Every structure is written in C-alpha cells, then in structure tokens.
Amino acid sequence: MTAVFADTFYWIAFINPLDKHAQAAQRFDDVLSSGKVYTTEEVLAEVLAFFAKDGWLRTRAVATVRELLSDPAVHIIPQSHESFSSGFELYAGRPDKEYSLVDCISMQTMRREG
C-alpha cells in the first residue's frame, strides 16, 4: 500500500477547481485512492485559513475537511505541543530557507512517521 503526505499546496489545488494545479491534484487523487494519505491538523488549519475570505471556496473547504475526518484512508495526525516544538526548532534553525512553520511541522512529521 502506498503512503503519501498531502500538504497544504495539494489540498488547496484539490479544493479549488480554478487553481492552476487543480487538474494535477485531481489526477493525483485517483492514485491516492489505492493508498493511505497522511496529513496533519496544522495543514488542515492552514487550508481553512487560506479559504476563509471566499464564501463558496470556504464552504468547499469545510466539506472537504469533514469528509477527510471520516475517511478511513486518510490519517490526520493531531496537533500537539511536540509537533509544534519540533517544527519550530526546524523553522528557527533554517533562516536560509523560506519554509513556513507549517511546512516545518510537516517535514518533522514525515520524518517521525517514516
């Protein structure tokens, strides 16, 4: 079984049919149906924040997150002080990169989950 990590970039393209990467996200979703998808609560929070100002897309984002929460093929890793601290340390230690804090939390989560 294939295991993949779905980040904010993917979910934004998946939710917004007008996103320039929407078609690629839909094609990738077909591949994901045969595997296990991992994401984090931090990623989902970032996605919801991204769509906060557009009523129609906000509604789509809420519906998508609700579906993910009940989908047994999607493993949503909960937020924790440990995930924040680990991501924060990577963020603080890499001033040469333009990683967001959520990117750093995601990278640390992928390392931890294998």
Outline where the language-model segments fall.
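Amphipathic alpha-helical segments within well-ordered protein domains
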Residues: 9, 48-49, 88
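Active-site neighborhoods of divalent-metal-dependent phosphate/nucleic-acid chemistry enzymes
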Residues: 75-114
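Glycine/charged-rich beta-loop-alpha catalytic/anionic-binding loops adjacent to active sites
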Residues: 28-29, 66-69, 85-93
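Short, well-structured N-terminal submotif of metal-dependent ribonuclease cores
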Residues: 1-39, 53-65
